[in-house]
């Protein structure tokens, strides 16, 4: 059995050894990364770590998460692109707590306790952006 998300990324069957994998970039891969509960849960986990381990400002948290994912700090234009996203999603989830609850119940692992749900949901979206950057997905 090969998980459907692995099929989207051209994973070989596990029945035999494969020394070289083909590389592709197709729209279905983006859909998997954005919609598969596994990847949403991974983003939520990164968001939880960001909020728990970085007690600074929103800008400092973006920089911390960026460094965790990409091993570098964001450039000025990248920070300028992400900060409105942080504010927009935070306002949205503070206004609609039910939407935050819906997002945070995705996956098997429970959300971290002691973190504001609206904040965790907003930072989950920021983490999804970081985890879906071309630079994150591709090695070269």
Region roles according to the model:
Residues 1-61, 109-140:
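An acidic, gly/pro-interrupted, aromatic-rich
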Residues 51-124:
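C-terminal structured "cap/appendage" subdomains that terminate the fold
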